[in-house]
């Protein structure tokens, strides 16, 4: 396998499938099947999940909520997704732990870096919830931060599109997909991959990002194996 330890970033929107809201159980099971194949190869996998299928802090803020309050609500939404994902993974036979940046001991472990790494070494999947525990930081930034903390070899951003484009492929039929590009190209071109804080964190810590389509069966395994899918961002 190309990567010994990887961090997978799942958006909340990915979990809702074609629904307008919430969690699609079939999507969760499809992700669990793909993750099971990856774990069986010996790759250590951590997951950061967003909460946009339930609540998005920026939208709450735009609607008049205090931004910090809205972000905390969004963090709680990610915990709901993390626990649901844990259930799906464990039903697929994958030992899984949820760690949250905001303590809620009845449902999850607190985030402790060394404990998370020990879980990974034992072949468990670790799902990180509640973002990084601070408002004003996205779950993409959390993914970059956790990847650096656990010494991940790569960040996988699994989305609804098959890579990074020079403009929105849903709006512009002539959009061009990049097979590979640099962090600096993403930052200077203001390409909508991750927010600039997340990109800068990966750039500074030399952690490549691979962006690919989550809904193509087997893509997580292909990405972990180092097959050329999606778009790769590196230094």
Curated annotation (Swiss-Prot):
Alphabetical UniProt keywords: Allosteric enzyme, ATP-binding, Cytoplasm, Kinase, Nucleotide-binding, Pyrimidine biosynthesis, Transferase
Q: What does the record give as the reaction this protein catalyses?
A: UMP + ATP = UDP + ADP
Task: Tell me which Gene3D superfamilies the record gives.
Answer: Acetylglutamate kinase-like
Q: What class of enzyme is it?
A: transferase
Q: Where does ATP bind?
A: 9-12, 52, 56, 159, 165, 168
Q: Which residues bind UMP?
A: 51, 71, 132-139
Q: Which GO terms describe its biological process?
A: 'de novo' CTP biosynthetic process; UDP biosynthetic process
Q: Give a short account of what the protein does.
A: Catalyzes the reversible phosphorylation of UMP to UDP.
The record's annotation in HAMAP family points to:
PyrH_B (MF_01220_B)
**Protein name, please?**
Uridylate kinase
């Amino acid at each position: 396998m190309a990567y010994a330890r990887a961090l997978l970033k799942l958006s909340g929107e990915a979990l809702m499938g074609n629904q307008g809201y919430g969690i699609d159980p079939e999507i969760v099971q499809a992700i669990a099947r793909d993750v099971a194949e990856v774990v069986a190869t010996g790759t250590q996998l951590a997951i950061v999940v967003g909460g946009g299928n339930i609540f998005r802090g920026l939208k709450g803020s735009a609607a008049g909520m205090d931004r910090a309050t809205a972000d905390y609500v969004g963090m709680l939404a990610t915990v709901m997704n993390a626990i649901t994902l844990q259930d799906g993974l464990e039903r697929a036979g994958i030992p899984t732990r949820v760690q949250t940046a905001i303590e809620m001991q009845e449902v999850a472990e607190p985030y402790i870096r060394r404990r998370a790494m020990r879980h990974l070494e034992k072949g468990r999947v670790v799902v990180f919830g509640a973002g990084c525990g601070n408002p004003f930081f996205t779950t993409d930034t959390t993914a970059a931060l956790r990847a650096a903390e656990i010494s991940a070899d790569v960040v996988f951003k699994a989305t609804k599109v098959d890579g990074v484009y020079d403009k929105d492929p849903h709006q512009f039929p002539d959009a061009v997909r990049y097979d590979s590009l640099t962090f600096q190209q993403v930052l200077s071109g203001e390409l909508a991959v991750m927010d600039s804080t997340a990109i800068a964190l990966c750039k500074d810590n030399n952690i490549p990002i691979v962006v690919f389509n989550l809904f193509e069966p087997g893509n997580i395994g292909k990405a972990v194996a180092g097959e050329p899918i999606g778009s790769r961002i590196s230094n």
